[in-house]
Amino acid sequence: MSEKKYTFETEVDKLLHLVIHSLYSNREIFLRELVSNSSDAIEKLRYESISNAALNEDDTDYAIRIDFDKDAKTITVSDNGIGMTEEEVIENLGTIAKSGTKKFLESLTGDKSKDNELIGQFGVGFYSSFIVADKVTVRTRKAGQDKSQATKWVSDAQNGFTVETITKEKRGTEVILHIKKEHLDLLEYHVLKGLVNKYSDCINTSIQMKKVEYDKDGKQTVKDEYETVNNTKAIWLRSKDEVTDEEYQEFYKYISHDFADALMWIHNKVEGNLEYNSLLYIPQNKPFDFWNRDKDYGLSLYVRRVFIMENKELLPPYLRFVKGVIDSADLPLNVSREILQHNKVIDKIKKAITTKILSELKKLASKDKEKYQKFWDSFGQVLKEGVSDDYSNKEKIAGLLRFATTQSGDSKQTVSLADYISRMKEGQDTIYYITSDSYKAAANNPQLEAFKKKGIEVILMTDRIDEWMMSTLTEFDGKHMKSIIKGDIDLDRFETPENKEKFEKEAKDFEKVLKEIKEVLKDKVEDVRLSKRLTDSPSCVVVNDYGMSLHMQKMMEEAGQSFMPGMGMKPILELNAEHNLVQKLKNEADTEIFADLSELLLLQAMFVEGAKIEDPMAFVKLVNKYIR
C-alpha cells in the first residue's frame, strides 16, 4: 500500500522545535523515554492477555531489546508489547493528547535552564528521539492483528510524517533512530548499557542487548546472543539495604519523567492480614500543570508485579502530588477500574499509605526544617485541602500546616500551629487568625491594631483555600480558632482596669450617635458599634460569628456563585471612639454632613477589607467632596 503523508498538529511542531533546540544538553533522556514507552506497552499486554491469552501469540518472553549498527548509524529499541494500529500511530505520534500542552508551551520563558526544568516536568516522551536522530522510523503491529496489517511511520521532524501499511512478523513496536553525526559516539555497547543502568536499571522488564566479548588485545566482538543488562527485580520488591540512593532517584525520574531528584521517598513492606509493597516519592517541585483539574494523577498499581493501571483511588486528592507504586498480592489480576472504586483491599491500602505519608511528613518537619519548608512551599496549598476532605486525619494535617504571622516578619509561611501555641500570651486560650487576598493586605489590616498593641500574635492567611479550610478547622490541640474579622473580640483579660472603665464610658457617650448612624446606614449594615479592635484607624467592618466573611463573599462572587438566602449577610460597622473623624461625626449637627461622614466611614472600611463597592464612582465623589 502506498504511503500517506500527514502534517503534525501545531503543538507537536512547537514541541519538536523545542526538544531539538533546547534539550541537546540532556540527550541521554531519549533512551529512558523509549524504554519507558516499551515497558508501558509490555505492561498493557500483560494485563490484557489475562482475559485474552491469544494476544500473546505464543510468546510470553516479554523483553525490550536495544540494538545498534555502526555502519547504518542507527539505534533500534524494540519490544514485544501491545503494539499499535495505524489509527493509534497517527494519534500517538502525530498529535499531543496530553492536556495542558498549550499552557505549557505558553509558559516557556526563553531561559534555557528554566525551560529545561519545565520540559522535565512536562515529559517529552517519544519526541526526545529527535534530540539525537535526524530521522525516526517506527514499525509496529498491534497484538492480535494480522501480520499484513502492521504500520510504518517515518519522520525527519521537519516535514510532517508518512504512514504506510507493511507486513511485520512479530507483534510489538520497534523504533529506529538514524543518529545525527554529532551523536555517533552513542553507537557503542558500553555507552548504551551505561544509559540503561543509569536510567532504567530497575524497570520491571528484561532489557536486552547482544553480548559483547573482548579478546586479549581489547578487540570487541558482538555476538548474536542477547543478554539481560538491567536488574529486572522490581526495586520496590527489594529490601531497603539493597537499594542505593542513586537507584531510588533514578527510578523516581523513570516513573515521573522529572529531571530533578525527588525530595524524599518512602519504601515500605507490609505483611499480615494485608500484604503489599510500596515505594512512594514526594517531588521537589510541583509540575507546571499541577492545578489542572483534568490532569490525571495516582499511583501505579501492580498485582503480583503485573501493572494494572494508574489509580486515583489509592490516594486522597490532597496527596495527589505523591508519585510511586503499590504492589499487592491481595487483588485479582483481572480487577477492573470500576471494582477498584468499591474495593475493601484498596480502601485499606489507601488508609494505610495515607497514614504513612502524613507520619513521614511529620518526621521530616521535625528532623529537617529546611527540607520540609521546600515541601511546604511546593505543596502546602494542596495539603490544606485535606483539612476539609479527610476528617479522620484532620488533626494530623493541621499539625503539618505552616503560616505567616504578625511576628514572622514576612510572607514566608514558616510558623506551625504548635509554634503559635508555644508563644501564646499568659491567659490566652484562643488561636487568632485573619484571612485576606494578600500578605500586605492582611498584615496592614486595621483589625490587627489592638492585637499588635497587646503583643498578641495573629496568623495571616492569604491562600484562596484558607477560608474553606477554616470552616472546618475550628480548634487545634484544645485551642479554639478565632477569626478576628468575625463577631466580638474579647481581649478584656489583657486590658487594664482603667482602659475597661474608659471603654464603658465611651460606649455610654456614643449610644445615641451609634443609633443615628445605624439609622442612616440601615439598608447597608446589620449593626453599628464601638470597636475593641481599633487603635489608630477610624472604622472597620466585621460579620457576626456565623456569617460569611466579606473576603469569602467576594471570592464566591468572583467564582460566579450565588448566595443562598442569609449567606451574604450585611456587615457590622465598628468605630474607633478616639479617632478625630469619629469625634467629628459625634459632634456634627448638619444632617447632610452627618450622613455623608457615616457613609464615608463605612465605604472606606469596606474598601480596606477588599469588599465589593457597589458604586465606586459615588465613593470617589464622596471623598472628593470633603477633601480640603
Swiss-Prot record:
CDD domains: HATPase_Hsp90-like (cd16927). Molecular chaperone. Has ATPase activity. Disulfide bonds: none annotated. This is Chaperone protein HtpG. Belongs to the heat shock protein 90 family. Its main location: cytoplasm. It is found in: Cytoplasm. One of its GO terms (molecular function) is ATP hydrolysis activity. GO terms for cellular component: cytoplasm. It holds the Pfam family HSP90. Residues 1-337 are annotated as: A. Homodimer. Residues 338-554 are annotated as: B. InterPro entries: HATPase_C_sf, Heat_shock_protein_90_CS, HSP90_C, Hsp90_fam, Hsp90_N, Ribosomal_Su5_D2-typ_SF. Keywords: ATP-binding, Chaperone, Cytoplasm, Nucleotide-binding, Stress response. Gene3D superfamilies: 3.30.230.80, 3.40.50.11260, Heat shock protein 90, C-terminal domain, Histidine kinase-like ATPase, C-terminal domain. It comes from Francisella tularensis subsp. tularensis (strain SCHU S4 / Schu 4). Residues 555-628 are annotated as: C. PANTHER family: HEAT SHOCK PROTEIN 90 FAMILY MEMBER.
